[in-house]
Amino acid sequence: MEITQIPVAKAQMLIRKPVAEVFEAFIDPAITSKFWFTKGSGRLVVSERIRWEWEMFGVSAEVSVKAIEANERILIEWSSSGGTPTTVEWLFAPRADHTTFVTITESGFNGDGDEVVRKAIGSQGGFTFLLSGLKAFLEHNIALNLSADHAPDADGKN
């Protein structure tokens, strides 16, 4: 089998909160850390470099903020463990009923065919967890712990 088109990871979900609240949940690490990473070095600001950490796994990602359009779009490049950066775009579509449809797309995966497919599938699963955690937290104030619980033995302590 030959890959003729590099895969793109995409996840999307309706969040039953106004767009400003949903958008801010990704800009402010004090909020994002309730449903995704455990620590962020600062708010997302265009041209800034930010570090996100998943302390339970001992991993982090360096994030370069490329574009922010308030309540509409976030564009970053990121890499973990010194890997080649990929591009992640969040799109926020407000709806008439004061809900928000969020779409996250990651592109730019590199490696051989098997590796690119593995990375894209993993990313899509991760962003699906992310949106599920966001939904539970913003709509019901419940922290599902999805990042930690999807791989409870990944820290090597159990």
Language-model features: where?
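Hydrophobic ligand-binding cavity/cleft-lining segments
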Residues: 1-41, 158
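Intrinsic-disorder/low-complexity, polar/charged segments enriched in Ser/Thr/Lys/Arg/Asp/Glu/Gln
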Residues: 6-12, 49, 60, 73, ...
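Hydrophobic/aromatic beta-strand elements that line small-molecule binding cavities or substrate pockets
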Residues: 13, 62-67, 87-94
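Hydrophobic pocket/interface hotspot
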Residues: 22-26, 32, 50, 65, ...
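Residues at helix-coil transition
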Residues: 27-28, 70, 132, 139-140
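Glycine-rich portal/gate segments that line the openings of hydrophobic small-molecule binding cavities
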Residues: 34, 39-80
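Beta-strand/loop substructures that line and gate deep hydrophobic ligand-binding cavities in soluble
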Residues: 81-129, 145-147
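Short, highly charged C-terminal tails/helix-capping segments
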Residues: 136-158
